[in-house]
Amino acid sequence: MGFQASERVVALNAQLEAFMQEHIYPREHEWEAFTLDQNNRWQVPDWFDVLREKAKAEGLWNLFLPEEYGDWGPGLKNVEIARIFETMSKVNWAQPIFNCNAPDRGNMEVLAKYGTAEQQEQWLKPLLAGDIRSAYAMTEPQVA
């Protein structure tokens, strides 16, 4: 199967790569040093939220929601999103900068597709804004 990226996706991917070059790649050593310090467990560096705000301001936010989810995302096709994620995933901690990380991403997809208006208001909108985090839990029948 061949895939020819649209001009929009090529431009978006170039914008994402430029952001990665300017803000993400230069911080890889800082990130590693920060995470190796056990005192920082479950923390993020001070600059992390600054980068999230920059990504949001540059329109590099919630890029994962495909066209069938309507106004919640940029309206890309799944095959287009794959190209974006290929770039984003070059650094293992980059996806949260763009609000495209698990488990939030999957939970937002479920809420966008199946959530009631009330659930979307209470949970989806704050997740899309990056104001809250989510979790995913699963058990087996007759276990819990």
Predicted segments with their positions:
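Intrinsic disorder at enzyme termini
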Residues: 1-16
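Glycine-rich flavin
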Residues: 29-144
